[in-house]
UniProtKB/Swiss-Prot annotation:
Its cofactor is Mg(2+). It comes from the Eukaryota. Highly expressed in roots, at intermediate levels in stems and at lower levels in leaves. Involved in the biosynthesis of ent-kaurene diterpenoids natural products. Catalyzes the conversion of ent-copalyl diphosphate to ent-pimara-8(14),15-diene. Mg(2+) 3 binds at residues 701, 705, 709. Keywords: Lyase, Magnesium, Metal-binding, Plant defense. The gene is KSL5. This is Ent-pimara-8(14),15-diene synthase. Pathway: Secondary metabolite biosynthesis; terpenoid biosynthesis. PANTHER family: ENT-COPALYL DIPHOSPHATE SYNTHASE, CHLOROPLASTIC, ENT-SANDARACOPIMARA-8(14),15-DIENE SYNTHASE, CHLOROPLASTIC.
Length: 821
């Protein structure tokens, strides 16, 4: 990998040395974790002096609990929805409940303080608990049972009624409508609340304001939202209009409470089939949303990947994605009708190599798909972000579906930032997503950020209302996921630090630090490997990747002017001869250092690969070096002869190989798992993958460095395209250059789409783990050459490297931690 010419700024954190330039890097301090939060947290997570061990819970216990959740979705009961289902009467008899088991569950699950719902000991009362309690009280009163339960529930509501009036308190979706609707039912049955009548009137006034105000979205989105919270509207609802939103499973938006309300109001007897199935399956309580398998399991898979621990659950994830794929090809409503779920499914399926087209996303091609939905009414940034991210998984340059989705979703997200329409935490997430596209993010850096921002189970109980009418928190094993992610991140940092020390020793052993022109940056170069091939077991792949990145950067500097023509030709001949290099000899000590660094390192890599590859593969590494230096020599000769290629194609014939990804990817591929035959390296697929990766790197480099390279007398694809389209000198040079950059961006996008299609496709000669290396390299290149905000700076790159390799996690944990096991 060639570092950009603009990386001269890296000198800010390099120190001059009599033996060349090598970055300052002191031995890492002992591994540690910085925990923000209450006392006693370290003990509960077993993160004491030995941060890499689990004392409270063993690693296999953590994995077993997460694995159980992956295999079987555990539905979290909703007191609110259970109460509404409990109010459904037997057909033809309004005096008998159809679902007595729901009533029994309500009677058995009241808290000591008289409330229902998820009540946290010692925590303040929230609107969700108040809503659940009121719903359960109304349900019991409906059947004249549980008199003592009703009394204690009313007492709880009376003491905490002020919470319902507090506009600063977080609320479930549609609270002003659902709570006031229940309050209206309660007063109609003769229930008396120990509160002032003015407070009750205040609740109804809030509902009036809610019903009369202009919403975020359109008239269509408002109708959808009102159907979703229809149980809170009662006689005010147009029930025929609600039925337009009934799904194949006979529910209304998969909401048990909405389905129950339509039955109670006599407008949807068919919903009884949905409720019968739901209650018989769960035998008592019902969840806030059903079915939710796709929603829950996709979220689990996505979370495990974002936290960097998905490798522990590859079999379970494969089973889940197989199930999601079946839902996708059958166009199942559970998957396709929810914007966020559908977009996440598309992204995960495509990135895991499932053969799916973007046709399933066509329903979101217009902005109206968001504006006219509940998501638009509720200003649902999360669903919009998921849609935006999925639009970047393009395998065809002319995929207009994803292109249009990406265009309008990015625009709406940008408008949210400008108008400050989102919460601060969401705004930061939006800004990050717009700045770092999916194809320019590095996994380990992302994972550290995700770990540090991950919410514990206790935080989710407080903040987890999201888009649902009652607090949906699921049964996801948040604390176990966090503990496992923290443990594995710490363990990997220990490995990374040792590997980096070994690489610094390798630099000295190869004498590369004696070359005054060499830009030796082991930690930044190693960061590109650790941030993509992060599992600890890929140690040899990371080391081979880093060694070859350092070597190719040094050789590139040599061909860029630090070597004479005689020295350059000598190095090329030495690499061509390889084992027969003794016949040629060395024209200088510099050439000798460079050649032996390449030669000896390549032989060491090949020897380490023998147990995996069952053969000596040094010839493949040597050949990749030959193509690389041959291209570099051609470019050097052009520069020295002041020759300008006549076409971009002529320039790229040398510039693609000279970008020098061949040695790096070829060497790393030997250690990622599969045995690679001669046919793999000789295949058209492998050659095409390499050409695409090199092309991406070359174009990114040229677009960022063309001004500097023109001053140095070097040719560049941007300059050549501008010259060839300048109309014989007519027109503005600046305009020609801008047009050239636009064309190069188009070619870059096409190459990136082609690369992703090859990497994610099912089948092929090159094994998937090897294909992924090309995509990893592409992501590294986009990250390194990022144009926005001048991110590629000395401070920025070193901070990123330190974040992955050295800096401890900053984790916020609450005392309850892992006390559940």
């Amino acid at each position: 990998m060639i570092l950009p010419m603009s990386s001269a700024c890296l000198g800010q954190f390099l120190r001059a040395s009599p033996r060349g330039m090598i970055e300052q890097f002191n031995r890492a301090p002992p591994l540690r974790v910085s925990i923000r939060g209450a006392a006693g947290v370290e003990k509960s997570l077993g993160l004491g002096r030995n941060a890499g061990s689990q004392q409270g819970m063993q690693k296999n216990q953590l994995q077993d609990k997460i694995r159980k959740q992956l295999r079987e979705v555990q539905l979290s009961p909703s007191s609110y929805d259970t109460a509404w289902v409990a109010m459904v009467p037997v057909q033809g008899s309004h005096q008998t409940p159809r679902f007595p088991q729901c009533i029994e569950w309500i009677l058995q699950n009241q808290h000591d303080d008289g409330s229902w719902g998820t009540n946290l000991p010692g925590s303040v009362v929230n609107k969700d608990i108040l809503l659940c309690t009121l719903a359960c009280v109304v349900a019991l009163k409906r059947w004249n049972t549980g008199r003592d339960h009703i009394s204690r529930g009313l007492n709880f509501i009376g003491k905490n009624f002020w919470v319902a009036m507090d506009e600063q308190t977080i609320a479930p979706v549609g609270f002003n409508i659902t709570f006031s609707g229940l309050l209206n039912l309660a007063t109609g049955t003769g229930l008396e609340f120990p509160v002032m009548q003015t407070d009750i009137d205040g609740i109804f006034h809030m509902r009036k304001i809610e019903l009369e105000r202009d919403a975020y979205g359109t008239a269509s989105s408002r109708r959808a939202f009102m159907a979703y919270v229809s149980e809170g509207l009662g006689s005010l609802q147009d029930w025929d209009q609600v039925m337009a939103y009934q799904r194949k499973n006979r529910s209304i938006f998969n909401s048990p409470s909405a389905a129950a309300a339509t039955v109670i109001h006599g407008h949807n007897d068919s919903a009884l089939c949905y409720l019968d199935s739901l209650v018989s399956k769960l035998d008592g309580p019902v969840p806030v949303m059903y079915p939710q398998n796709a929603y829950s399991q996709l979220g689990m898979v996505d979370t495990l990947e974002k936290m960097g621990i998905s490798n522990n659950f590859s079999c379970e994830i494969s089973d889940i994605l197989d199930m999601i794929y079946r839902l996708w090809i059958h166009n199942e409503e559970e998957l396709m009708l929810d914007m966020g779920t559908c977009a996440m499914a598309f992204r995960l399926l495509r990135m895991h190599g499932y053969d799916i087209s973007s046709d399933g996303m066509a329903q979101f091609v217009e902005q109206s798909s968001f504006d006219d939905s509940i998501h638009g009414y509720l200003n649902d940034t999360k669903a919009l972000l998921e849609l935006y991210r999925s639009s970047q998984i393009r395998c065809l340059e002319d995929d207009l579906i994803l292109q249009d989705i990406g265009s309008w979703s990015a625009r709406v997200l940008q408008e949210k930032i400008s108008s400050k329409m989102t919460h601060k935490s969401e705004m930061l997430e939006v800004e990050y997503a717009l700045k770092f596209p999916v194809y320019a993010t590095l996994e380990r850096l992302e994972q550290k950020r995700n770990i540090e921002q991950f919410k514990t189970k206790e935080q989710l109980k407080i903040e987890g209302f999201k888009l649902l009418k009652s607090g949906y928190r699921g049964a996801i094993t948040h604390d176990e996921i966090l503990a496992l992610a923290v443990d594995e991140f710490h363990s990997s940092q220990s490995v990374y630090q040792q590997e980096l020390q070994d690489l610094n020793s390798w630099v000295a052993q190869t004498r590369l630090d004696e070359l005054k022109f060499a830009r030796l940056m082991p930690s930044i170069t190693y960061f590109s490997a650790a941030a993509t091939m992060f599992p600890s077991e890929l140690s040899e792949a990371r080391i081979a990747w880093t060694q070859n990145c350092i070597l190719t950067t040094t050789v590139d500097d040599f061909f860029d002017g630090d070597g004479s023509k005689e020295e350059m030709e000598n190095l090329v001949k030495l690499i061509e001869k390889w084992d027969g290099h003794g016949e040629i000899g060395f024209s200088s000590e510099c050439v000798e250092i460079l050649f032996y660094a390449i030669y000896n390192t390549s032989k060491q890599i090949a020897e380490k690969a023998v147990p995996l590859q069952k053969r000596n593969v040094v010839d493949h590494i040597a050949e990749s070096w030959w193509f690389t230096v041959r291209g570099m020599l051609t470019e050097a000769e052009w520069r020295m002869d002041k020759y300008v290629p006549t076409t971009v194609e002529e320039y790229m014939s040398a510039a693609v190989d000279s970008f020098a990804l061949g040695p790096t990817i070829t060497s790393a591929a030997l250690f990622v798992g599969p045995e690679l035959s001669e046919e793999v390296f000789r295949s058209k697929e492998y050659i095409h993958l390499m050409n695409l990766a090199n092309t991406i790197g070359r174009l990114l480099n040229d677009m960022q460095t063309y001004e500097k390279e023109i001053k140095m007398g070097k040719v560049n694809s941007v300059m050549l395209h501008a010259l060839s389209h300048s109309g014989g000198g007519r027109g503005s040079p600046e305009a020609s250059m801008e047009e050239a950059k636009r064309e190069m961006r188009r070619v870059l996008q096409g190459s990136r789409c082609d690369l992703l299609r090859l990497v994610t496709r099912d089948g092929g000669v090159v094994p998937p783990p090897c294909r992924k290396l090309f995509w990893f390299m592409s992501k590294v290149l986009h990250f390194v050459y990022m144009e926005k905000d001048g991110y590629f700076t000395a401070d920025g790159m070193m901070a990123s490297a330190n974040a992955v390799i050295l800096d401890p996690l900053q984790v916020t944990l609450l005392p309850s931690g892992l006390g559940t096991l």
